[in-house]
UniProtKB/Swiss-Prot annotation:
Keyword Transmembrane helix among UniProt keywords: yes
Transmembrane stretches, start-end: 8-28, 41-61, 72-92, 110-130, 146-166
Superkingdom field: Bacteria
Protein keywords: Cell membrane, Membrane, Transmembrane, Transmembrane helix
Subcellular location per the Swiss-Prot or TrEMBL entry: Cell membrane
Record's bilayer topology term: Multi-pass membrane protein
GO cellular component terms given for this protein: plasma membrane
The protein, known as: UPF0397 protein VVA0348
Pfam families (UniProt xref): ECF-ribofla_trS
Organism: Vibrio vulnificus (strain YJ016)
Family matches, as InterPro entries: ECF_substrate-spec-like, UPF0397
Family, per entry: Belongs to the UPF0397 family.
Length: 182
């Protein structure tokens, strides 16, 4: 895998923003060891703008950073879950034929964005919950409750914040003021 310097910088910035933004002081505690993080919008934005590889790495590295600084130890199962969320949401550009880059973001695109956010959260954190049950002998009811709360809460948060951000990105791209070579 050969990543360009730009891609590495984007991953570093995204992971830092997602990681620091995911700290408990910026989140809303909702259940045992479960916090709704507004930083999920950062993960979604980087995934949509830069694709599945960047999305995965921003989620994976960023969640690792959160766990390190929060002081509760690194839960690799949930780190992997965040990576999977970023990867799935990162499919958006290819599924929409890069319409966002052309300044287009319609209701169909928004619906796809929300579906990808839901699938990413259910599948990504579903893997985390399953692995917690298998590897750490966590009670199934606890991890299932965490999964349900996180998947629904994150999807709503990503949909609301993401709508306004992606509308703004589309508007900016439509005005052709983005930084591209002539």
């Amino acid at each position: 895998m050969n990543l360009s310097a730009k891609t590495v910088v984007v991953i570093a910035i995204g992971a830092a923003l997602y990681g620091i933004g995911g700290l408990p002081m910026f989140g809303i505690p909702v259940f045992a060891n479960t916090t709704l993080k507004p930083a999920m919008a950062v993960l979604a934005l980087f995934s949509v703008l830069f694709g599945p590889l960047v999305g995965f790495l921003v989620g994976f590295i960023g969640h690792w950073v959160t766990d390190l600084f929060a002081g509760w130890g690194v839960w690799l199962t949930w780190v992997l879950g965040s990576g999977i969320v970023g990867l799935i949401i990162g499919l958006f550009p290819s599924l929409t034929r890069n319409r966002l880059e052309k300044g287009e973001f319609n209701l169909k695109d928004f619906s796809l964005f929300v579906v990808l956010a839901l699938l990413g959260n259910v599948f990504g954190y579903g893997c985390s919950a399953f692995l917690d049950t298998i590897l750490y002998a966590e009670p199934f009811t606890k991890v299932f409750t965490q999964l349900t709360i996180i998947a629904s809460g994150n999807t709503v948060l990503i949909a609301i914040v993401g709508y306004f951000i992606l509308k703004s990105v589309a508007k900016r791209n439509k005005q052709s003021r983005n930084l591209t070579e002539a």
